Amino acid sequence: MEEIVIVGRHAVKEAIVSGHTINKILIQDTIKKGQINEILKLANSNKIIVQSVPKSKIDGLSDSPHQGVAAYIAPYEYADFDAFVAQQKAQDKLSTVLILDGLEDPHNLGSILRTADASGVDGVIIPKRRSVALTQTVAKASTGAIQHIPVMRVTNLANTIETLKDNGYWIVGTEAENSTDYREMDAGMPLGIVIGSEGQGMSRLVKEKCDFYINIPMVGHVNSLNASVAASLMMYEVFRKRNYIGDKA
């Protein structure tokens, strides 16, 4: 059976809680049980195999800090796009989906998933080509958010955007030229927010599908932001516009 490895106490705990299929948990043999008591209880109640191993064993599984905990899990499953759209239409809320056009850095994707979960974004769309997939590096960087945010992997991003538009979404692209300050963005309708790659920005076909463009003003010496930072600003601007202070999102 194909499987991948995740490391870190929080990532492993979130995988158990979310119901993800876990084949085995590895615990560093020098870790005191009191430090991982919650994980051990969850593993026991879910009948998950737990194996005590030397630190070198876990070191060999990942270059990331692992806190003495790792797990072999089933591959991450991508959400079905058509089912996602139908589900969003059935809900009485303004939907937001993030569209990542050519993002290739797994740490950026993990960070974006983390912020998407925190800010109430409903789903993330990535293309099958020219894009990072859901890997253990993404899982680690997301600190467990990968278990909670639907990620859809599509063949044709431009066609997918057209389907979103047919279902009431307005598509907003991040673009420096001929665009509006993101603080003036209207968030009163279902939104698809496009984040282009750091090197190339949005592809031509995707850019042509956008309904309007926004920019993030910068007054310092640099002229660009990390993709995950730009995405975070956009997501929380939508959150700010839709949620008054003191209201529960």
UniProtKB/Swiss-Prot annotation:
GO MF terms listed in the record are: RNA binding; RNA methyltransferase activity
- List the SMART domains: SpoU_sub_bind (SM00967)
CDD domains linked to this entry: SpoU-like_RlmB
Keyword terms:
Methyltransferase, Transferase
Q: Which GO terms describe its biological process?
A: methylation; RNA processing
Q: Which InterPro entries match?
A: Alpha/beta_knot_MTases, Ribosomal_eL30-like_sf, rRNA_MeTrfase_TrmH, SpoU_MeTrfase, SpoU_subst-bd, tRNA_m1G_MTases_N
Residue numbers binding S-adenosyl-L-methionine: 196, 216, 225
One Pfam entry for this protein is SpoU_methylase
The Enzyme Commission number assigned here is 2.1.1.-
User: What cellular component GO annotations does this protein have?
Assistant: cytosol
Q: Which family does it belong to?
A: Belongs to the class IV-like SAM-binding methyltransferase superfamily. RNA methyltransferase TrmH family.
Name of this chain's protein: Putative TrmH family tRNA/rRNA methyltransferase
| Source species | Staphylococcus saprophyticus subsp. saprophyticus (strain ATCC 15305 / DSM 20229 / NCIMB 8711 / NCTC 7292 / S-41)
